[in-house]
Amino acid sequence: MNNKRHSTNEQLSLDEINNTIKFDHRSSNKQKFLSFLGPGLLVAVGYMDPGNWITSMQGGAQYGYTLLFVILISSLSAMLLQSMTVRLGIATGMDLAQMTRHYLSRPIAIIFWIIAELAIIATDIAEVIGSAIALNLLFNIPLIVGALITVLDVFLLLFIMKYGFRKIEAIVGTLIFTVLFIFIFEVYISSPQLNAVLNGFIPHSEIITNNGILYIALGIIGATIMPHNLYLHSSIVQSRTYSRHNNEEKAQAIKFATIDSNIQLSIAFVVNCLLLVLGASLFFNSNADDLGGFYDLYHALKTEPVLGATMGAIMSTLFAVALLASGQNSTITGTLAGQIVMEGFLRLHIPNWLRRLITRSLAVIPVIVCLIIFKGNAAKIEQLLVFSQVFLSIALPFCLIPLQLATSNKDLMGPFYNKTWVNIISWTLIIILSILNVYLIVQTFQELQS
């Protein structure tokens, strides 16, 4: 990576929201914190999207509470990586897509753009599938119609954006807490053993020695750290009105944006733990192998003998509501991330509605095509979700490495560059994640072929 300076005529990242939300560095710490409360919510969505659900619940159903430790480590790793994107966005005034295009050679930057665009599409595919399945479960809407309905999210997003980015943050926050409270209720009803849950946060050697547990563990790790979140976060932290030329204000902005990020990622951590605990408390040592997808989970909750007919119906319906809320949340953030990647790499100057419609269509079209080819076969569509998660594993190093190189560059970051301990941990994480993701990809294709 060269040390070319950030061009002063660089287009602002997400210019319609950039520098629009008031942040007064002279106000109290409480006011500063409240000013920066919000971007982390949009990032947290990616850590509890529909792609994570099956992995977490399967992990609990098949191996009890053992994998809670893996969720903890994954969440702590995510906090570190997201804090690096916060520093990149605030210190440089660039998002990760702009930085990658600006500081890598053109041929390499183009390759990175293609991979980033495909990663956004893969992320969106999971959300479209999750939302379509939720609509089918709740209202018996055909999957193909449900997938088409998700296109309307684009226009809903455009409508809400007219009233300010704070409205987006509020809606996303409401949907997140809807999911959180649904799963708190469901876990409470399922009555897990507290001692067993707490024991799950202690590392167990079988996570490494048992191939089945290791495979699920890798799935949890791979589904937790999402490429689109790194692009998204580096952009939306710039929505606050801190001085772009005052390092003291930048330092305060980084501090409170990081606090916001860590709080919201802690909520995502709790949701993922609740999913695993729910799977363990209801299905461990029973019909765990039958929980292959959203439909399986829905019907398993509905017919679970421990719950009874009435509570089973309530639990399964709430599960579908939470799936819809999660899918809608993720489509909002995925669309924004797609806009950031398209603008950042290509400098496209097209109307917002068209840019977002293109981003959404690129995700919906593959789902529609597969629905037509497989004649609405739900199992095949859920398999498409698996493929989308595998591609995210492939794409992850292509955004982690530029992020690491940029944030460790003192000429680029100024006083906000990575400290030595951060570099050691982040490089270790990148290497481990890359190795684990290669293993996960191989294992997934072997599973699909068997």
Curated annotation (Swiss-Prot):
Protein role: H(+)-stimulated, divalent metal cation uptake system.
Main location: membrane
Superkingdom field: Bacteria
Membrane topology: Multi-pass membrane protein
Family according to the record: Belongs to the NRAMP family.
Keywords tagged on the record: Cell membrane, Ion transport, Membrane, Symport, Transmembrane, Transmembrane helix, Transport
Name of this chain's protein: Divalent metal cation transporter MntH
Disulfide bonding pattern of the chain: none
Entry's Gene Ontology molecular function annotations: cadmium ion transmembrane transporter activity; manganese ion transmembrane transporter activity; metal ion binding; symporter activity
